[in-house]
A protein has these predicted regions:
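Short, exposed beta-strand-loop hairpins at the edges of beta-sheets
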Residues: 118, 150-151
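Short, solvent-exposed loop/turn and secondary-structure capping segments
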Residues: 54-57, 125, 150
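Low-complexity, Gly/Ser/Thr/Pro-rich intrinsically disordered linker/tail segments
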Residues: 137, 141-142, 151-188
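N-terminal capping segments
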Residues: 1-76
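...with weaker cross-activation on analogous glycine-rich loops/strands in unrelated enzymes
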Residues: 62-138
Length: 188
């Protein structure tokens, strides 16, 4: 039986503030090989959840550059994991952070936005890190930004992900300090 705990938006935001403009040495920098955006957002969400799902192919985890789930670093796979697409949910048992598609008005700092081109291909993942005078501010890697207005991105399509909680098999110790300081991956 799974237990549910709240997602810690504040921890995700603190992590983003610390690492948006630099790199945590615990994680490979994918900027030169497809982009580091989804990895960075995954790191932020991990800081706010401390739960990974180690199911090969359909999980959400990072141990090393060669031992990671596609959802930790891939835009579409990230969305499918978090929105619990049936194939993912059947394969991975639902452990880990989860969310749902949301409107712009429903998201808050700590939630996620993804950008698509005119053909509808989603290519960029960003963390919402603030709201100022009604404007969503985002942080991301690849082109490193912290609190950049979302309106400055020229993307024909956007989709929003509201992170609703974290499913776990038992009590989870905090991972924040080791992750935030770049000293230790959770459960490693």
């Amino acid at each position: 039986m799974l237990l549910y705990k709240p997602y810690d938006n504040d921890a995700a935001l603190a992590y983003a503030r610390r690492w948006a403009l630099s790199r945590n040495p615990l994680f490979y920098n994918f900027s030169g090989v497809g982009g580091d955006c989804t990895s960075f957002v995954s790191q932020c969400v991990l800081a706010g959840s401390c739960v990974m799902n180690f199911t090969p192919d359909f999980g959400w985890y990072y141990r090393s550059v060669n031992d990671r789930a596609p959802a930790f670093t891939g835009v579409e796979y990230f969305w499918d994991f978090f929105t619990r697409v049936p194939a993912f949910l059947r394969a991975n048992g639902g452990i880990g952070p989860f969310g749902r598609a949301a409107t712009r008005e429903e998201v808050t700092p700590g939630d996620v936005v993804q950008l698509a081109d005119a053909a509808g291909d989603f290519y960029h993942t960003l963390l919402i890190t603030a709201v100022r005078e009604g404007e969503l501010l985002v942080s991301a890697h690849s082109n490193d930004v912290y609190n950049r207005p979302l309106s400055e991105y020229d993307a024909p399509q956007k989709r929003f992900l509201r992170i609703e909680g974290v499913a776990c098999a038992g009590m989870i110790p905090s991972c924040f300090a080791g992750l935030y300081t770049g000293r230790r991956l959770p459960f490693s």
